[in-house]
């Protein structure tokens, strides 16, 4: 591969990686924001004597996300990601 093409590809790669770094930072911020809110919800649930795990609510969340998903994220991958997020948030409420 000639040097000019390689240099162009390298710049594209660096640019895309920087974009991913920004997205990752935004995701981290949003995940921490979500966790703070779920901690508050957990306190309210305890005060009300409610269970932490609400399978119906989780199903509603997943169904809504599936309807809104336009891809390329596959439905099963979306489910796995959000099940993990919800599990981590749920465990933090205990």
Regions found by a protein language model. Name each.
Residues 1-94:
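Domain-level signature for soluble enzymes in the chorismate/prephenate branch of the shikimate pathway
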């Amino acid at each position: 591969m000639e040097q000019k093409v390689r240099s162009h590809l390298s710049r594209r790669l660096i640019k895309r990686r920087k974009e991913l770094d920004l997205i990752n930072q935004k995701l981290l911020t949003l995940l921490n924001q979500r966790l703070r809110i779920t901690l508050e919800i957990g306190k309210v649930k305890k005060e009300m004597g409610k269970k932490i795990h609400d399978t119906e609510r989780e199903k509603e969340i997943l169904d809504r996300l599936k309807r809104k998903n336009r891809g390329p994220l596959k439905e099963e991958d979306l489910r796995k990601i959000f099940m993990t997020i919800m599990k981590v948030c749920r465990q933090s409420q205990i």
